Amino acid sequence: MTEQNLLSSLAHMISEQRNPNSMNLDSLSPLELVTLINNEDKQVPLAIEKVLPQIAQAVEKIVRTFQQGGRLVYIGAGTSGRLGVLDASECPPTYGVKPEMVVGLIAGGERALRHPIEGAEDNAEQGKADLQQINFSKKDILVGIAASGRTPYVIGALNYAKSLGAITISIASNPDSAMASIADIAIDTLVGAEVLTGSSRMKSGTAQKLVLNMLTTASMVLMGKCYQNLMVDVQASNEKLRARAIRIVMQATDCEKEVAERFLKAADNNAKLAIMMVLTNLDKQQASVLLQRHQGKLSRALSQ
């Protein structure tokens, strides 16, 4: 794209407009600044509320993908890419899933998580190449993230995924974007102009984070990764999470700390299995078989 064409494109993007509420930004006091930012941030959940049906549709597709052995892959550049990597990295400790179940890719690779990589987002072919590097297939589902909706790296990845027959989802902060025209499901979080003109790490980034939270949380809940509202598949990999696992067993079964610790030890620190054992008086093997029979969904297993 020529510089003139890019300037014309940016001029029409909501995320690149000047916000009339912040025209005097450089003359505000600290309290006035943070009050303004906070007031603008209040628009984010309202914008997301308008696309909840599309988010729910995406969750249904993600769950079906997981059930069929596929992966959820996020791809983006800059803030968008970092948020995808962040959400993906939280899934193993929270839900006890393998790291490859939810994958985050960022333009420029690992170094781009901490440092800007010049020109990385402009390479559409690299988006395709990065998917090929992880053996992306039509069994997987791709979520392309970019506030602008036009990032070449993400568009290249979406086009490649589409060519394979994979389901594609876009998350953007501008309407009628190039990404939305490619994706099977377009999630357009129209949060309006940023307080600092063009700084899409702000409201647009906040909207992306909230949507990603919804996608993985709702999908994992539907996959049986929680009981009531407890993260029963938590991996007790550090002191805080070990304490949380004990509390989860206590909360789910109304047992004492010593009982929770004893059953967790018998269940190899598997909180879900420990809860099953406490509530049913089954041994580890019997409880495990019953859980497997119900696809790991504790509520269903307990109802038998």
UniProtKB/Swiss-Prot annotation:
Keywords: Carbohydrate metabolism, Lyase. Residues 62-225 form the SIS domain. PROSITE patterns: GCKR, SIS. The keyword Isomerase does not apply. It catalyses: N-acetyl-D-muramate 6-phosphate + H2O = N-acetyl-D-glucosamine 6-phosphate + (R)-lactate. It holds the Pfam family GKRP-like_C. It is an enzyme of class 4 (lyase). Its EC number is 4.2.1.126. One of its GO terms (molecular function) is ether hydrolase activity. CDD domains: SIS_Etherase. Pathway: Amino-sugar metabolism; 1,6-anhydro-N-acetylmuramate degradation; Amino-sugar metabolism; N-acetylmuramate degradation; Cell wall biogenesis; peptidoglycan recycling. Transmembrane segments: none annotated. A lyase-type mechanism (elimination/hydration) is suggested for the cleavage of the lactyl ether bond of MurNAc 6-phosphate, with the formation of an alpha,beta-unsaturated aldehyde intermediate with (E)-stereochemistry, followed by the syn addition of water to give product. Homodimer. Belongs to the GCKR-like family. MurNAc-6-P etherase subfamily. This is N-acetylmuramic acid 6-phosphate etherase. The lineage of its organism: Bacteria, Pseudomonadati, Pseudomonadota, Gammaproteobacteria, Pasteurellales.
